[in-house]
């Protein structure tokens, strides 16, 4: 029976295939109909394509906005409620009476527990921050003290034991030969009280030579265009500044040493007396122009003496010295008091003897 049913099915399939082939042959023999297929238009064909960078940026911005929104929501949730009452109606709404007549708050126990938890969490965070800052300060102070102790130990031992190992222990482990005082400047954690300690490696000594400001014009010529309004000192006395005195003293000491080495005796006093006698002999007893006794004697640059009136009248005619012919440039100096007195004594004694 089963074989017969299978043969019948095969025959039916064969017949159906033959019919389909006949229909296809007829369609091929007949006039073929043209079928047009249109592609569906794209809805977004007029929209310009966006670059990949813009898409990434927009997606990142959207993610950031979502994160900011979530953070703001979290902050709003974390804000604790402040139990502050301003009116009686709010108090009535907040509080209710139980069946037993006892007053109780209408706030849920869950809300109270959440607010208490948030307050406790904030206080805990503050305590953690304060404790961490204190620990950091204490650690810094301990490190500084330990370093100073190590340095002092190395100094006490001479630094020979530590440095001969060949192990590098940092810059602070070098042996220092300068003693450090136990001041706050060294052991205070960033706190420096009082003045800083001066360096012990070198010392500096200053010497300041204070000398008055002398008017140069008045000292050389005896005249100043500013007059009494001049801020400099009007002084014509000869004096040496500090550096000149020191220089002369050093030269004298050098000369003494050389003389002692060569076996020459020091005869400075005798030489000075001889020089003074020669100078007194060199002073002229009368003015070269008027051939008379000096009246207000004046000295030129070439160290020749004339009367003041005689020198000025001669300068109007000739700008050179009357004796040697060197240019005076119109400058006449009044000699120092010591030389003036000697000059006047010589001239007076000469003219007295003649009379």
UniProtKB/Swiss-Prot annotation:
For this UniProt record, the keywords arranged alphabetically read as follows: Metal-binding, Zinc, Zinc-finger
Instruction: Note the zinc finger regions (C3H1-type) by start and end residue.
Output: 214-237
The record ties this protein, via Pfam families, to: zf-C3HC4_3 (PF13920), zf-CCCH (PF00642)
- Alphabetical list of InterPro entries matching this protein: CWC24-like (IPR039971), Znf_CCCH (IPR000571), Znf_CCCH_sf (IPR036855), Znf_RING (IPR001841), Znf_RING/FYVE/PHD (IPR013083), Znf_RING_CS (IPR017907)
Q: Where is the composition biased (Basic residues)?
A: 37-48
User: What cellular-component terms does GO give this entry?
Assistant: nucleus; U2-type spliceosomal complex
What name has this protein been given in UniProt? Answer: RING finger protein 113 homolog
Q: Which SMART domains match?
A: RING (SM00184), ZnF_C3H1 (SM00356)
Which stretches are tagged as biased composition: Acidic residues?
62-71
Question: Biased-composition ranges for Low complexity?
Answer: 8-18, 99-110, 131-155, 259-271
Q: Which PANTHER family match?
A: RING FINGER PROTEIN 113B, ZINC FINGER PROTEIN 183
Tell me the SUPFAM superfamilies matching this sequence: CCCH zinc finger, RING/U-box
Which CDD domains does the record cross-reference, listed alphabetically? Answer: RING-HC_RNF113A_B
Lineage, top-rank taxon, reads Eukaryota
Q: Where are the zinc fingers (RING-type)?
A: 287-325
**GO molecular function list:** zinc ion binding
Region named Disordered = 1-167, 258-277
């Amino acid at each position: 029976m089963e074989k017969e049913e299978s043969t019948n099915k095969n025959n039916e399939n064969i017949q159906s295939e033959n019919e389909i082939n006949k229909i296809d042959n007829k369609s091929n023999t007949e006039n073929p109909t043209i079928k047009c297929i249109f592609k569906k238009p794209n809805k977004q064909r007029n929209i310009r394509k966006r670059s990949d960078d813009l898409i990434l940026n927009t997606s990142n911005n959207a993610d950031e906005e979502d994160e900011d929104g979530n953070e703001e929501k979290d902050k709003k949730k974390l804000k604790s409620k402040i139990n502050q009452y301003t009116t009686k109606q709010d108090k009535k709404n907040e509080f209710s009476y139980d069946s037993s007549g006892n007053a109780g708050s209408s706030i849920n126990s869950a809300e109270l527990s959440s607010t208490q938890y948030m307050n406790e969490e904030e206080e805990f965070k503050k305590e953690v921050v304060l404790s961490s800052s204190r620990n950091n300060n204490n650690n810094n102070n301990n490190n500084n003290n330990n370093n100073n102790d190590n340095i002092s130990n190395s100094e006490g031992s001479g630094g020979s034991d530590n440095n001969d190992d060949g192990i590098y222990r940092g810059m602070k482990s070098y042996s220092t030969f300068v003693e450090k005082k136990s001041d706050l400047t060294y052991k205070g954690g960033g706190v420096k009280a009082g003045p800083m300690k001066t360096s012990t490696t070198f010392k500096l000594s200053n010497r300041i030579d204070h000398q008055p400001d002398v008017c140069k014009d008045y000292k050389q010529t005896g005249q100043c265009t500013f007059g009494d309004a001049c801020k400099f000192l009007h002084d014509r006395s000869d004096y040496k500044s500090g550096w000149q005195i020191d220089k002369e003293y050093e030269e004298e000491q050098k000369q003494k040493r050389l003389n002692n080495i060569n076996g020459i005796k020091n005869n400075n006093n005798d030489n000075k007396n001889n020089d003074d006698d020669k100078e007194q002999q060199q002073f002229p007893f009368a003015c070269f122009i008027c051939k008379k006794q000096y009246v207000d004697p004046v000295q030129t640059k070439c160290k020749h003496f004339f009367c003041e009136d005689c020198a000025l009248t001669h300068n109007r005619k000739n700008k050179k010295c009357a004796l040697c012919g060197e240019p005076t440039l119109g400058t006449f100096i009044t000699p120092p008091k010591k030389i003036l007195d000697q000059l006047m004594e010589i001239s007076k004694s000469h003219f007295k003897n003649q009379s």
